Each structure stands twice: as structure tokens, then as C-alpha cells.
A protein has these predicted regions:
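Extracellular and organelle-lumenal recognition/adhesion modules and their flexible linkers in secreted
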Residues: 2-15, 22-609, 616-629, 669, ...
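Acidic/histidine-rich catalytic cores of soluble enzymes
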Residues: 208, 377, 554, 751, ...
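Substrate-binding cleft and catalytic face of glycoside hydrolase catalytic domains
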Residues: 308, 632-646, 655-762
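Short, well-ordered coil/turn segments that N-cap beta-strands
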Residues: 357, 604-608, 629-631, 666-670, ...
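Aromatic-rich peripheral "rim/lid" segments of glycoside hydrolase catalytic domains that contact
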Residues: 565-566, 571-573, 687-690, 695, ...
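Aromatic-lined carbohydrate-recognition surfaces of secreted/lumenal glycan-active proteins
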Residues: 607-613, 719, 741-771, 820-823, ...
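Acidic-and-aromatic substrate-binding clefts and catalytic sites of carbohydrate-active enzymes
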Residues: 611-621, 641-654, 680-681, 724-734, ...
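Short, acidic/polar
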Residues: 614-627, 697-706, 768-781, 835-844
Length: 949
């Protein structure tokens, strides 16, 4: 069996991953094979030599100092040339063996060294490779660092410094320093320089080269880059491990393993990442210079696992990106549950928003001690998928129940069957009225029969009545579920009752309720099927074994979205519009009588915002869409504690600062999400490990640090996220901690409205967070003195049905607090249906008087928390769902045309917000003025001064 190995050694570096806030700081030093077979110690992300076509013209003038110090300048120090015949030695290889070199001496600071202006010889967005031969002389003890750096100067902004590379140098030995850089834009002046050793140590430089490695613009013009070109070199290991390295572990090339039981799925070889001590250890390749920003790539890896008695584990493809400002970013491309039995494909897409000085793709994931096997890896420009057409749904039969014998009118359970060995029978005495949510959808309806199914002899929670509905479902139709349920006597604890659907092997939640009494309860839910199932059934389940279940009037019917929106338009007119009378002054009324008036609303005051991320704002196209279409923002992760303090005492507010600066400079209001997160899985390990006293101190420091830093800058704060679903801080610090968090936050920033925030409030799917539980939770906080000022409904919803959402809003509205949808997203594989869902949710919010704003949880493909939920494709094309967003927002703008009456006035009815009015007199004189229609129920009289017309 052939074996080739590459080894490495590691120390901890920071890995900032959204999906895993507990990654620790780590640095990696690896030993990788170089061209002559020797091994050299290098940084973990510096050990791959990219194989890229290049222009060999050297950017550096006088690269070998054969012209003395021509074009070179010492930076606040001195420099002199040592030639081969000088007879001078600095303890390194003699000049006769290495030729001329420069000595940089009398250095008083580490940054002092030798520099050259290269402004006229570099271009933006190109990749350059730097190679320098350096040494040190003088009072050297141990290793000395030498660095290559760029100084970027602009007259109108502070000087920036871009790190290129560094190497460790021993005394009396020449060492090669290599690295790469790319400039996203060209500053007024670019200076390359070498620096680094401690003061008093001389820096010796034999030669410096900077070569163009990649010019994307030229390659596009010459047709060098083709759509199906694989960016990965040696993707199938036909050339052994060339161009590959271990990410802080050893990698081995095999043609077989396990006595021939493991062989390549394709090709003749595969690689194994072995001796892994961290889950992020794996196999990697550098693809710097090959990846264009704002372009979508698809990565496909064929993987499996081996060893350590692990038979199944998550394997992930990840991209490490280093930006020119040295900010690291980790992008999760795809993950798959791999086994030790067979090869499996791990496939996903990625996009770089900003410029990158380094890009490395690697495979990671399984627990330490388990080998990752990689058969092949490809990275190609992703094909554009054409949008799917709107589904053709014939005869949707809105409001028609698809179930058989729902009313049990013949006194039998015909059409139903027991799931399990329970017993079904028919009894009388159930409600004859429709459940409220169904009544809102169906309107006037004949009474129910009053009969119900009694389910007895239940020995498992899943036992209950069931019915096959495979042939009755239509793809892409949204169905509403409605039923009355009741439990038999003898229950001694709260019981969940659930309407469930079995769609092939998938469980679908059709609604749940918690019951702790002997009354009838409504269950309301919804679902949609987007792929033809081979088997579909509906069943009712949930109570403990031995508890009898009663089911009455179960209905499943398609909902008429357009009819609901028509109703919501009328409702919105009542609460979001006002009668407006424009009174024109400053000009004689007789001159204005009959003048033409054109009123155009420029901005609706109803807040519509979105989630953004630090990496996204590096993408100009993203920022353009964001600023044009949203007036509020929330940060996806960058304000969360696990992001701002991943390790104790190591604070990172820079990302949040950058995002806040973008928003404030463009008059975008912001929500602060979130100060704390009550779910334990989201809490950093260093916090989880604290004792009670230390944790209490850390909580107070978090409040003080965050709220003082951003005082007055965030309009809202989600104080302690998802308290209905988590209890970490309450369990550790007692019940009063939640109230104290609110009190302290209010003391530190009285201007901010403090919100509770949770999920599954509006969809009937989770008894833990039904509106009644949320109300109870809020009242409990308020009674103990917590200044709760707003209700956050996250809104991660599937197949929304208006009356179900509205029912939750009505119940929460009794508290009199402003309600916001704080993280709204919808999902469908069909863009048109996704747009339908978004339209439903936007109108339900806009049409309800208790709702005061909507925040989308993102809009850009590859930067969403849910699949098939984006509104704009990754390369900037607005899809059908995005077009629906724009159409709804356009509907929320009022326009009016007419003439000024004899009293110098013009009346219209319009949505609240900002307006422009153009007045054109009979003599064709024009004037343009602006005004604001404020919220209010009564008619508003607004004076418009036309003086000067």
C-alpha cells in the first residue's frame, strides 16, 4: 500500500464561527513538504503553495541590490550594501556565496526597516506573491520575526497597514519569507516594506520579488477562466499529496485501507486526515487568488470517516478567509452525516462578499481521534438555477374539507382507523360551533354535528385516530387544520395534544395545544406539501398512555390567501391611513384655485427592517439593496455575547461598530439583539464553567460594558432571548436574575425599549410558547418590576395562515405593548409561493393595530438561517419572492392627483409617512414641497407654505 505523509504541530488560534461560538483561540504551526523534499515550519494557513499562472514581471525595482540602494529607502534608520568582495561578514553565508545584500541598522523601533514605493506598479483586485530572502545579525537570542507589510496612504483618511506575511529567523541563516496580498482598491500611495526584529538587531535582505499571480479582469478578457474549471489542484490525489496539507494534523495518501475494505469511490487514491486532536483538524488546500468576490461557487467533497469506534459523525466543508485588514472569517459551506461504511457527498455553495488576502478550503468536523477520508474535492463556479414557474393549481377548492366523515354524521368511524391498538368509537356532546380560527377563514358555516371520536385503550402517546389523505393533497396549496380536542378524566399533569401528518417518512406538525382540564380546546395549524408523497396520513396523538382522547370536527382545507389580503387591505386603511387636508399658504388663494396637485408618498413610516452581518456590508450590491428597501436593521450575531466576548476578557466590538456606523450614517434605526440568550447551547463554555458569584459578576459586566458603550444608539434591546425555551441564567442565578437584567438595562440606557423575544408564538406549533404562556411570562416579569416595553415575535414560520397569526396577535394585543415581528422569514422551494407567504405575513402585521414593525431575518442567498428563504439571489438578482416584497412596499405608498379648491386646499387619504407635493399653477409655475403625515385617527390639516411661487 502506497503512503505519503504530511505532518503538522499545532497551538491554539481564534475561529469565529456563527454556528459554534465556543471555538477556542488557536494558532497552528505545520510542517509541510516543499519542492525539494525538506520540511519547513510555517503558519497553519501559510503552508500551501498555490499553482496559478502568473506574470513574471517583478514589481520591485532593483530586487537584488545590484544597483546599491537605488529605489529603496530606510525607514527612520540606516541602510548600507555589502558586496561579494567587501570582506565583511555578518555571521551568515559569506557574500561570495550569496552575492550583494543590504544591511538595515541603527533600528530603534520594530517597525523600522527598508521600504519601496510600488504605487505605479500594482493594480486593484489582483493577487501578488511576495518572496524575500532575509536574515538577522546582532544581539539575537532564539527566533526573531521578520514581517512584510504594505503601507496604504490616502490624504483624506488615516494611513492603513496591511500585513502580508512573517517568518521566524535564526541567527546566521538566510530564510525565505513568502506571502500574498491583494488590494480591493488602489490608494494614493502603496509602500512595501520589511520590518520586525527588535530594536538593535540588524535586518539583512538579499533579494525581494513581487510577482503578479492572478489578474481576474485580464483572465476574463482572455477567456482563461471557464465555468467548469476546478479551483482545486490535484483534486483526486493522482499526484499524491501535492498542494494538500494537514490542518494541524497529519495527512496520508492511500490506495486502500482496512485490509482492502476501503477503496476509492473514484480514481486511484484518497487522503486521510489522521492524528486529529480537535474537531477542526482536517485536510486543506489554499485557493487564494482563484476566488472572485461576489461570485457563487459550489464545493463538492466525497468523504467518509474511519476509526476510534465512531460509526457516524458530521463532516463539514469550511472556508477560512483572511481579509486585508487581518480579520478572519469562517464560512460553513456544507455538512453531511458521514459514516464508516460508505462514501458520501458533501455539497454546498459559498460566496465572498469582500476582498480576501488569503482563502483556504478545508474538511473538518468529526470528534478527535476519528480520521477524515477525502476521495475528491471540487470547487467550481455554481451554475445559475433558472427560477421555477408559478405552480399551476387546478380547482383549489378553497375552504373545502378534504377529510372523509369528519362530522361522523352516520354515527360510525368509517374512513378512520386507529393508529396502534387503541379503540375508536362515536359519542355525542362536543361543540357545534366552528373553532374561532377556522371560523375566521371559512366565514358563515353550518354548525358541527356535535359528535366526536372517543379514543380509548391507548397504551402509547402516539395512538389515536388516523386517516389516509395521499390522493387528496395538492402540491403548493397551503392547508389550514382545525379541530376541537378534549381529554378524559384522571389526568394529573399537563398533556400535549398534537395534530400530526406523516408525509412519507417525515413528521409534520399540524398544531399543538397543552391541556390540563376537562374542557374542549381548539387546535389550529397549517402545512403545505411541495413534493409528491407516496404516502400521507393525518393523525391525532400526544396524551400519556391510559388517557382517553376526544376529537371533534377535524377539518383540513385549502386557504384563500387573496381573499384574506383583500380583507387586510380594508383593515390597514383604517389603522395605517389618515384623512389629510393640505392647506396652501403664502400665495393668494385666487392664484392657486384650480392649480394641479401631485402628491407622492416617498416613505411609509411603518418600520420594515432586516438582519445584516459584518461580512455582508462588504458587498456593495447587498448594501445598495439594504439601504433602498429597509429603514431598520438588526445584527445577526455581532452584538451577541458569544461574538463580542468569545473568550473571557477578549472583547470584539469592532464588527458591531462597523455595522452601526453604516446604519447611523444612512438614518437606519437599529435593534439591539441580544444582551443575553437564555438557551444553554448558545452560552460560551467559559461562562458555563463559572461558579455563581463569578457568573453574576460576568452578567453585570456584560450589561455595563454593552449598554454604556452603545447608550442611545439602539432603539430596542432583546434583553434575554428565548426565555420560554431556555433557563440557563435563571437556573444558575435564581428567578430574580431575569427581572434584574431588565432593571439594570433600563437604568443604563433609559431611552431603549426593552423587549422579550421568542419563537413559535404565532403558528400554534409549540405549547411552550403559545400566546397564553407568553402573556403569563410577560405579566410575571412586569409584576416583579421588570420594565418590559415590547413584545418580540420572531416569526420563523412555515406555511402561514392569516387567521392563525391574527389570533395570536389579538390575544397578545390585550397587554397594550407594541408588538414587533423581530426575525421574520418564510421558506419554499418555489419563489412564487415564498412570495405568497411573505405577502401574507407582511399584510397580517401591517393590518393589525398592535404591530409596530417588521424585521426580516435576512434577504440575501447564502446568508440566511433557513434554506429556500432568500429574496435576492447570491449574485444580486432579485427573485420572485423579493419582487413581492417590493410590490407590497409599493402598495404601502399613497399617491393622489387633483386640483386646489377655491379655499386653497387639497384633500386626500394616505398612509402615514413622508410625502412630496408638486403644485403647478395655470401659468405653469412649479413648486415642490415635502410634508409628513403623522400617526393618528383623526383628519390631519397640514399647512404647505408656497411663498415665492
Amino acid at each position: 500500500m502506497k503512503r505519503f505523509t504530511v505532518c503538522c504541530f499545532s497551538n491554539p488560534i481564534h475561529k469565529n464561527k456563527n454556528h459554534n461560538p465556543d471555538k477556542k483561540l488557536r494558532n497552528s504551526m505545520e510542517i509541510s513538504r516543499n519542492d525539494n523534499g525538506e520540511h519547513a515550519k510555517q503558519n497553519n494557513n501559510n503552508n500551501v503553495t498555490p499553482i496559478i499562472g502568473s506574470d513574471r514581471t517583478n514589481v520591485i525595482v532593483n530586487h537584488d541590490f545590484s544597483l546599491g540602494t537605488h529605489s529603496w529607502h530606510p525607514n527612520c534608520c540606516e541602510a548600507s550594501i555589502v558586496t561579494g568582495d567587501s570582506g565583511i561578514s555578518h555571521g551568515v553565508l559569506g557574500p561570495s556565496k550569496c552575492g550583494s545584500y543590504v544591511v538595515v541598522k541603527n533600528r530603534k523601533e520594530t517597525w523600522q526597516g527598508l521600504e519601496q514605493d510600488i504605487t505605479s506598479r500594482v493594480k486593484p483586485c489582483c493577487l501578488y506573491k511576495v518572496s524575500a530572502t532575509v536574515a538577522v545579525s546582532g544581539p539575537v537570542q532564539g527566533l526573531v520575526e521578520v514581517m512584510a507589510t504594505l503601507k496604504l496612504e490616502n490624504q483624506q483618511s488615516p494611513t492603513n497597514y496591511q500585513f502580508i506575511a512573517k517568518t521566524c529567523v535564526f541567527k546566521e541563516k538566510w530564510v525565505r519569507l513568502e506571502g500574498m496580498f491583494s488590494l480591493p482598491s488602489l490608494p494614493e500611495r502603496v509602500v512595501f516594506y520589511l520590518e520586525g526584529p527588535s530594536p538593535g538587531i540588524d535586518l539583512l535582505i538579499q533579494s525581494v520579488t513581487i510577482h503578479l499571480e492572478s489578474d481576474p479582469e485580464r483572465e476574463r478578457q482572455e477567456g482563461v477562466t471557464v465555468e467548469d474549471e476546478n479551483l482545486v489542484v490535484n483534486p483526486n490525489f493522482e499526484d499524491g499529496l501535492n498542494n494538500w496539507s494537514g490542518r494541524s494534523c497529519k495527512i496520508v495518501c492511500h490506495d486502500s485501507m482496512a485490509d482492502g475494505k476501503i477503496v476509492p469511490l473514484s480514481g486511484k487514491a484518497f487522503a486521510a486526515a489522521t492524528e486529529r486532536t480537535q474537531n477542526w483538524n482536517g485536510i486543506q488546500q489554499e485557493i487564494t487568488g482563484k476566488v472572485e468576490r461576489k461570485r457563487v461557487y459550489e464545493a463538492t467533497a466525497v468523504v467518509r470517516i474511519y476509526g476510534n469506534n465512531v460509526t457516524s459523525a458530521t463532516v463539514q466543508a469550511t472556508l477560512w478567509v483572511q481579509n486585508p485588514n487581518q480579520r478572519d472569517q469562517y464560512i460553513g459551506i456544507a455538512n453531511v452525516q458521514a459514516t464508516d461504511k460508505e462514501w458520501i457527498q458533501c455539497k454546498g455553495k459559498f460566496l465572498l462578499n469582500g476582498s480576501a488576502s488569503r482563502v483556504v478550503i478545508y474538511i473538518e468536523g468529526p470528534p478527535p481521534g476519528t480520521d477524515i477520508l477525502l476521495n475528491s474535492l471540487t470547487v467550481k463556479h455554481a451554475e445559475k438555477i433558472p427560477p421555477s414557474p408559478r405552480p399551476a393549481i387546478e380547482n383549489p377548492a378553497f375552504g373545502v374539507n378534504i377529510l372523509t366523515n369528519s362530522q361522523l354524521t352516520d354515527g360510525t368511524t368509517n374512513g378512520w382507523f386507529p393508529l396502534g391498538n387503541c379503540t375508536l368509537s362515536v359519542a355525542e356532546g362536543s361543540p357545534r360551533i366552528l373553532p374561532p380560527m377556522a371560523r375566521d377563514s371559512l366565514g358563515p358555516h353550518e354548525p358541527l354535528s356535535g359528535r366526536y371520536m372517543l379514543v380509548t385503550n391507548r397504551t402509547q402517546t402516539w395512538m389515536g385516530p388516523a386517516q389516509m389523505i395521499t390522493d387528496k393533497l395538492k402540491l403548493f396549496l397551503t392547508y389550514q387544520i382545525s379541530v376541537w380536542v378534549k381529554l378524559g378524566s384522571g389526568i394529573n399533569s399537563p398533556q400535549n395534544v398534537n395534530v400530526a401528518l406523516g408525509i412519507d417518512s417525515q413528521w409534520v406538525n399540524g398544531g399543538q395545544v397543552e391541556i390540563n382540564d376537562d374542557k374542549w380546546h381548539e387546535i389550529g395549524g397549517s402545512f403545505r406539501v411541495e413534493k409528491q408523497p407516496s404516502k400521507a396520513l393525518v393523525y391525532i396523538q400526544g396524551p400519556s398512555s391510559g388517557v382517553d382522547l376526544m376529537v371533534a370536527g377535524l377539518q383540513i382545507f385549502p386557504v384563500d390567501r387573496l381573499a384574506r389580503i383583500k380583507h387586510l387591505r380594508r383593515q390597514s386603511d383604517k389603522i395605517r391611513r389618515s384623512d389629510v387636508i393640505l392647506k396652501f399658504s403664502g400665495v393668494d388663494a385666487s392664484k392657486l384655485s384650480g392649480a394641479t396637485v401631485k402628491v407622492r408618498q416617498t416613505r411609509n413610516s411603518f418600520p420594515v427592517g432586516t438582519c445584516i452581518s459584518r461580512s455582508s456590508i462588504d458587498n456593495e450590491d447587498f448594501v445598495d439593496f439594504f439601504l433602498k428597501n429597509f429603514n431598520w436593521a438588526v445584527f445577526g450575531n455581532e452584538l451577541k455575547w458569544y461574538w463580542t466576548e468569545p473568550e473571557q476578557g477578549k472583547l470584539n466590538y469592532q464588527d458591531a461598530d462597523d455595522m452601526l456606523n453604516l446604519c447611523s450614517s444612512n438614518n437606519i434605526e437599529t435593534r439591539g439583539h441580544c444582551i443575553f440568550w437564555e438557551v444553554q447551547a448558545t452560552v460560551q463554555q467559559w461562562i458555563q464553567n463559572m461558579n455563581q458569584n463569578d457568573l453574576n459578576t460576568a452578567v453585570q459586566n456584560r450589561l455595563t460594558g454593552l449598554l454604556n458603550r452603545y447608550k442611545g444608539k439602539f432603539k430596542h434591546y432583546d434583553v434575554n432571548n428565548e426565555m420560554l425555551h431556555g433557563s440557563f441564567y435563571q437556573d444558575k442565578l435564581g428567578k430574580d436574575i431575569r427581572v434584574n437584567m431588565f432593571k439594570t438595562a433600563h437604568q443604563l440606557d433609559p431611552s431603549a425599549t426593552l423587549f422579550v423575544n421568542d419563537y413559535h408564538i404565532e403558528d400554534g406549533c409549540d405549547p411552550k410558547s403559545c400566546p397564553e404562556k407568553y402573556i403569563e411570562h410577560i405579566l410575571d416579569l412586569q409584576e416583579k418590576g421588570a420594565p418590559v416595553g415590547g413584545i418580540g415575535i420572531q416569526g420563523h414560520i412555515d406555511s402561514p395562515v392569516g387567521p392563525i397569526v391574527c389570533s395570536a396577535l389579538d390575544r397578545l394585543g390585550i397587554l397594550g405593548l407594541p408588538i414587533w415581528f423581530t426575525e421574520l422569514d418564510v421558506s419554499s422551494i418555489n419563489e412564487h409561493i415564498r412570495g405568497d407567504d411573505l405577502e401574507v405575513m407582511m399584510w397580517e402585521a401591517f393590518g393589525h393595530p398592535a404591530v409596530e414593525g417588521i424585521m426580516l431575518w435576512g434577504f440575501w442567498e447564502l446568508f440566511m438561517s433557513r434554506d429556500n428563504s432568500h429574496l435576492v439571489n447570491a449574485e444580486g438578482d432579485v427573485n420572485e419572492a423579493g419582487k413581492r416584497l417590493l410590490a407590497v412596499k409599493k402598495d404601502w405608498l399613497s399617491h393622489a392627483n387633483g386640483h386646489i379648491d377655491q379655499n386653497g386646499a387639497f384633500a386626500f387619504r394616505g398612509y402615514h409617512g413622508n410625502y412630496a407635493v408638486e403644485v403647478i399653477t395655470s401659468s405653469s409655475q412649479k413648486v415642490l414641497k415635502t410634508f409628513v403625515v403623522e400617526k393618528g385617527d383623526s383628519a390631519q390639516v397640514i399647512t404647505v407654505d408656497l411663498q415665492g411661487l
